[in-house]
A protein has these predicted regions:
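Active-site flanking loop/helix segments enriched in acidic
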Residues: 25-54, 83-87
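Short, surface-exposed acidic
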Residues: 18-26, 111-119, 174
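Divalent metal-dependent phosphate-bond-processing catalytic cores, especially two-metal-ion Mg2+/Mn2+ enzymes
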Residues: 1-13, 41-49, 56-68, 80, ...
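Non-catalytic interface/linker regions that flank or bridge core catalytic/transmembrane domains
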Residues: 1-24, 34-36
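His-Asp-centered metal-binding catalytic motifs of divalent-metal-dependent phosphohydrolases/nucleases
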Residues: 51, 70-87, 100, 121-127
Length: 227
């Protein structure tokens, strides 16, 4: 087994070891670990850090055209985009976004405060259902929206996404699995980064995987299952 198979790079990103963006994110990570939703089934620490990780990858992709400040604004938005999320399907994601914005306003650092409006605009792009088509957004809003909708492509997606959302939505695992084919089939990436990260063959492979889970879950056991 290789070191890369067991060692994550989140500390590398938070410290900004590669000097990709302005400053570092260590202060915000410490705050994030104290958020009310770090242990939620889906809208948890793993999700918020996964979106941050993806936004870092996008920053690397666009490093020749984005400034270090623009990258930092995106990463701060990613960290806070689900801050204090209640973890329940309430049908009012605008209220969940407001919780995130309140957390940002309360904890934003002095050096980031002049860019509060830009960071807030990026966070607001993650409100679902979407009020504005992704193609009509600015590049930073497009990136965070694509990152936020792409955790299905991680290897731990069944536990994190399927089981996590089933718990938060008070649905069965099969209910959520049945949603995956239409969701993934309608997933469209508009940024060059997103298109390279998740080409259509990758999306198709994930659809087939979700279909496989659905087929197994819909089978009926013919013999009693030992307890």
């Amino acid at each position: 087994m290789k070191i890369a198979d067991v060692q994550g790079d989140i500390p590398f990103i938070l410290r900004n070891d590669a000097n990709l963006y302005e400053g570092n994110l260590k202060h915000y990570f410490r705050l994030l670990c104290k958020a009310k939703n770090v242990r939620r089934p889906y809208h948890n620490l793993r999700h918020m850090l996964h979106v941050t990780w993806l936004c870092y990858q996008a920053s690397r992709f666009y490093r020749d055209t984005w400034t270090q400040r623009q990258m930092r604004n995106l990463l701060v938005a990613a960290i806070f985009h689900d801050f204090n999320h209640p973890g329940a399907q309430q049908g009012d994601d605008d209220l969940n976004i407001e919780k995130a914005l309140r957390g940002l306003r309360q904890h934003i650092t002095v050096e980031d405060r002049p860019y509060l409006a830009e960071i807030e605009a990026i966070i607001k792009a993650t409100e679902y259902p979407y009020n504005v088509p992704t193609a009509e957004l600015g590049i930073f809003e497009q990136v965070i929206r694509e990152a936020d909708s792409s955790q299905a492509f991680s290897v731990a997606w069944f536990q994190q996404v399927i089981v996590g959302l089933a718990d938060e939505w008070e649905k069965t695992i099969l209910d959520v699995i049945k949603m995956q084919r239409p969701f993934l089939s309608n997933l469209k990436f508009v940024t060059e980064w997103g298109k390279q990260m998740w080409p259509q063959d990758v999306i198709n492979a994930k659809i087939l995987e979700s279909d496989g889970y659905r087929e197994i879950l819909e089978e009926t056991d013919t013999e009693p299952v030992p307890v």
